[in-house]
């Protein structure tokens, strides 16, 4: 009986300890920032405002100061001020715009010595944002010549199965494809539904960076034969030391600045041509269904998805998320943001060894906005207003140029990332495009 009593007492003590250490279901200081227009879109000349609702331990904040700064997208602040919480709410008025674009507000407040921060952007007539980049008269001729030359280079494909990365549903292989010129290779992962059937094919180009890429089997799980590629000539089995060496070789990773002096030698020429070579490979596969070809990616991958769809008529649809490389001359026009890598952005420390005019002449042949003008197939496009990597001003300028059928999924609160729900809608849309 005594042992039973002691055991019961011990169990009760443990229960008490666990109850005392139950993690909170929300932070002690909890706040949300809400634009005065529910869709975060304003007409030109409208006054933009944010409502900040904050609680600490379930009680509304009182007499706590909110500091804020505001300005045009990715530009220095032109407005600053303070407001005070009353009954858990503070209203921050942060100005307007008289030209189409985006405006940000950065705010902060302190509770018990802890600083809480948020940044939010709102749009002003975003559908009216127009390009700053020139549209060269010989743009199409330049790319036709480039692709004609690149097509003469044999593919010389090597495929190495990777059973350790495969599953009963998806077969994964390492791929090496010669592209653009002899000795230049694209490396990637081929992921195939492991069912012996024929399937649509999907090209999946990468985000920016000289880095290791990983397989993306989820597209194959959705029924797409997928080629996930790198663009910087790094084999999938490269060592960390080899990747570091490649980073140093490619301007410490800033490869977007290589070859700005001339459109014929700019770094992205072989990258863009390589996208078409990847489609050559995909449509040659025996389990390709012979009909459906898609491309999808985010950031640099979103940019390359637009480029591929514009250059290769075999592509039937694309899904592009917050594309980089859009309207690259934006920062040269004063209060206007340009796309990643944000040439001439305020505070940029990159050395540019050519004239600004020459740089933008070169870039006009590579600006994704000029490829967006030439899209002829349906597209799914998605971005968020709070993106500081690929500013929404640049993304919106490019998407506005697309005249082909398009679905635009805007999630104002997202930044350089997207919600799982957005992915689900994009995947469903891509499946629906397949015949």
Q: Which residues does each PLM region occupy?
A:
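Bacterial Sec-dependent N-terminal signal peptides
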Residues: 1-22
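Proline/serine/threonine-rich low-complexity linkers at boundaries of modular beta-sandwich domains
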Residues: 20-31
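N-terminal cap/lid segment of alpha/beta-hydrolase-fold proteins
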Residues: 36-38, 151-196
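Cap/lid segment of the alpha/beta-hydrolase catalytic domain
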Residues: 211-273, 330-339
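Gly/Ser-rich "nucleophile elbow"/oxyanion-hole loop immediately N-terminal to the catalytic nucleophile
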Residues: 254-299
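Hydrolase active-site cap/lid region
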Residues: 302, 306-354, 410, 418-421
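Short beta-strand/loop motif that positions the catalytic acidic residue
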Residues: 375, 381-383
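C-terminal catalytic histidine-bearing segment of alpha/beta-hydrolase fold enzymes
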Residues: 389-435
